Amino acid sequence: LYLTHLSTNGAKMSTLKRRLVSIGVIHKLKGHYLDTKHPAIIENIMGIKRRKGSVQKGKKPILINYLKEIINVIDDQNKEDIKKFRDRSIILIGFSGGFRRNEIVSIDYDDLDFVPEGLKISIRRSKTDQFGEGFTKALPYFDNSQYCPVVSLKKWIAISKIASGPVFRRFVKGSKLSKKRLTDQTVALLIKEYLNLAGIDSKNYSGHSLRSGFATSAAESGVEERSIMAMTGHKSTEM
């Protein structure tokens, strides 16, 4: 009833979830147990979410079927291979690692460690790592090499001959590769461009859609919530 009351007074879903956690902590401190994951409470939360339509308000996640369509469209473009390998690597790395778009463009050559199992990428700093302690994301080889982020990135590194500095760079004068790092806005524009080319309305998607798509797809596959959050860097379950 308390959550419903807050909801009718305009509280957001993120606020309701924080309040629920706080209530659970207070009960614990007083020696009482409150199961915040009790079916009745979960049903109440889901009912509020449906009424608010909170899922529809945000940008949509790019799920695996759309991810494959994007990669197929990139491969079919009448562009130089070097451009296609850059763009497909951005998309595949961004999705498979649950990266924020600013994390994608911040990757340097020295952050990459190709290992027999796949690829380790060092993240020197992120939105939720304000002290710059850094962490590592590990990406395995995929069975289907066409959609494998590790295979794609290897080809991009080889064709671009990048051996230091930013991994994802701008092109100047056609297909000439510069030393300048891409901006995170460029990642968002690339996503929208290829969605449109695939016949998918891009207005409901953003640069965040790769990361949320990874989290959603992993959850639907049965991956534990804390494992997903460790990969994406989420501090809460609010996508």
Q: Where does each model-flagged region fall?
A:
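Extended, non-catalytic subsegments within catalytic or DNA/protein-binding/adaptor domains
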Residues: L1-M239
